[in-house]
């Protein structure tokens, strides 16, 4: 079998040469390649294949290397036997059987948790009850911590009494006498002296009993005590000898003072305030002038009727 020499100088460009080179490239076998995953599986899962590969390499160097084209053709016709990966279910079962419970509890990683969840769908449902879960691991840690705290506080561990059901039933049947009061257990109290102690002060100390003339306050706070009426002192007659500085009268209803401080009668003072000049003497009267005012108890109609009667009586006269 002739081997193709790829290093010979190529002839000038032509249609025939290009077609020949294309056919030669198409007929050239492509060596098989392995993915990274298959290579890892070869090294980790199939140790026998690794030894076989090392033996074949030793024979290869001892016998001599064949030509490159013959090696490529042999690989294309008869590819090397690849490692057969185990099934997913078998792999899950093997991993679950190989992992011990102690190691599983010591390292609860997320990978173990993921493998466990996938394996639960593949294994028998009765096996799932005995298989620990990630939540069980956390609960076991919490329970162990609580039991340790209880053992620190109490002299006897409570877990031993809780695990034994017979002891639990016995404790329920036993009477609980902690809160029962038994007077026979207590000694009777005997006072040292039988004579009563004398009272220091037998008389009552309440202020109501000590005061003889005390009057208690009224019971109803809303009822106020009657207050005595204050008597108004009589006004001092300071104007008994007063004389009006304008009209020289001694009788008036009210004495007033002008701007200069002089004493004036009521008529003269009001006239000055209204007209801004002194009251003339021609307007002076001997008596006190009063207005004709109706009484407070009289109605206005009766007052008008009385005025008309007076005017009619005066006209008849």
Curated annotation (Swiss-Prot):
One of its GO terms (molecular function) is RNA polymerase II-specific DNA-binding transcription factor binding. Pfam families: GATA. It is found in: Nucleus. It comes from Caenorhabditis elegans. This is Transcription factor elt-3. Residues 1-34, 290-317 are annotated as: Disordered. A zinc finger (GATA-type) spans 244-268. Residues 307-317 have a biased composition (Basic residues). Disruption phenotype: RNAi-mediated knockdown reduces expression of ugt-9 about 74% at 3 days and 95% at 7 days after adulthood. Suppresses the longevity of long-lived mutants daf-2 or eat-2. Suppresses transcription of the gst-4 gene in a brap-2 mutant background.
